[in-house]
Amino acid sequence: MIQYIKGDLFTHAIPAGKKVILAHACNTHGSWGGGIAAVFRKKFPKSNNEYSQYCHKNSNLLGTSFIIESDQPNILIACLFTSDFNQTPEQIVHFTKQSIADLARKVSDYKEVEKCDGKVAINMPKINAGIFGVPWEDTESALQEFDNLHFNVYVI
C-alpha cells in the first residue's frame, strides 16, 4: 500500500519504542551527491561514510539494498541500489523492484520497526524521480506490487 504524506520526510514521527526506516534510491558509486541524497549526506554524515565504504568494498550492488543504523537513534536508512547512472528508466524500475524485494527480506524479521496495518512501513520520497529521471508513475507501479510493505511517500 502507498500512502502519500504532504511534508518533510525527515520530520516523520518515530513511534515510541520503534525504529523508522527512511529509504531512498542510491547510486552504486558511494556518492550521496545530489537531490535528496545530498540532504541525507548532510543530516547523517556517519551513515554517508558507511554507505560510501560499503559501495567501495562491494560490487554487483544493483538491485540490492543496504540498511544503515543512522547517526540518530531509532532511524534506519535503507539504501536502494537502483542505478549506476548507466540505466534506462525501464532498467531502473527493474532494479527498484529487486532492491525493494531485497529490503523486504531483510526487514521481515525486524521486530522493533514501525508498522502500519501489520506491515513494515518504509518512508521515502518519490524515489528515482529526481536525478535518475524515472517518471514517478513507473516507480509507483513497481511499489504497488509489494503488498507485504506499507510505503509512506513524502511529497512537498
From Swiss-Prot:
Keyword Secreted: no
EC number: 3.1.3.84
Family matches, as CDD domains: Macro_Poa1p-like
Annotated GO biological process: DNA damage response; purine nucleoside metabolic process
GO MF: ADP-ribosyl-[dinitrogen reductase] hydrolase activity; phosphoprotein phosphatase activity
Domain Macro positions: 1-156
Pfam families linked to this entry: Macro
Reaction it catalyzes: ADP-alpha-D-ribose 1''-phosphate + H2O = ADP-D-ribose + phosphate
CC terms in the record's Gene Ontology section: nucleoplasm
Chain residues that bind substrate: 7-9, 25-27, 32-37, 127-133
PROSITE patterns according to UniProt: MACRO (PS51154)
The entry's keywords: Hydrolase, Protein phosphatase
Family listed: Belongs to the POA1 family.
Biological role stated in the UniProt entry: Highly specific phosphatase involved in the metabolism of ADP-ribose 1''-phosphate (Appr1p) which is produced as a consequence of tRNA splicing.
Protein name (database record): ADP-ribose 1''-phosphate phosphatase
Gene source species: Candida albicans (strain SC5314 / ATCC MYA-2876)
